[in-house]
Curated annotation (Swiss-Prot):
GO molecular function: mRNA binding; structural constituent of ribosome
Record InterPro entries: Ribosomal_bL12, Ribosomal_bL12_C, Ribosomal_bL12_C/ClpS-like, Ribosomal_bL12_oligo, Ribosomal_bL12_oligo_N_sf
Record GO biological process: translation
Name of the protein: Large ribosomal subunit protein bL12
GO annotation, cellular component aspect: cytosolic large ribosomal subunit
Protein family (similarity comment): Belongs to the bacterial ribosomal protein bL12 family.
Listed transmembrane segments: none
Organism, scientific name: Desulfitobacterium hafniense (strain Y51)
One Pfam family per UniProt: Ribosomal_L12
Coiled coil: none
Subunit: Homodimer. Part of the ribosomal stalk of the 50S ribosomal subunit. Forms a multimeric L10(L12)X complex, where L10 forms an elongated spine to which 2 to 4 L12 dimers bind in a sequential fashion. Binds GTP-bound translation factors.
Role noted for this protein: Forms part of the ribosomal stalk which helps the ribosome interact with GTP-bound translation factors. Is thus essential for accurate translation.
Keywords: Ribonucleoprotein, Ribosomal protein
Lineage summary: Bacteria, Bacillati, Bacillota, Clostridia, Eubacteriales
């Protein structure tokens, strides 16, 4: 009889309590867990629960230039490095993204500059 068959026969003869002790001994000896991995699958047609991840990249969207359009154009040029014509087209075409995929701190700083110039801004 092979070693595997002998071990299997020995395990067959154990009680439930003895098997539980054996599992604990294996976990301690080899540093493993006997817990079965849990696979979660969404049922067909069921909506998956949204994952609550913290957003790391933000888009700064100019919603409206407001009364201080010239100042907003100046700030847009400063932020983006665009030329006068391109910055004016961006401001005139609002709502449009001014900067995309920036950090939260950068997005808040850009928003503050644009709001100070008179614009309405959203950070998405």
């Amino acid at each position: 009889m092979s070693k595997t068959a002998e071990i299997l026969e020995a395990v067959k003869g154990l009680t439930v309590l003895e098997l539980a002790e054996l599992v604990k001994a294996f976990e301690e000896e080899f540093g493993v867990s006997a817990a079965a991995p849990v696979a979660v699958a969404a049922a067909p047609g069921a909506a998956a629960a949204p994952v609550a991840e913290e957003q790391t990249e933000f888009d700064v969207v100019l919603m409206n230039a407001g009364a201080g359009k010239i100042n907003v154009i100046k700030v847009v040029r400063e932020i983006t490095g665009l030329g006068l014509k391109e910055a004016k087209e961006l401001v005139d075409g609002a709502p449009k993204p001014v900067k995309e995929k920036v950090s939260k701190d950068d997005a808040e700083a850009i928003k503050a500059k644009l709001v100070e110039a008179g614009a309405t801004v959203e950070v998405k």
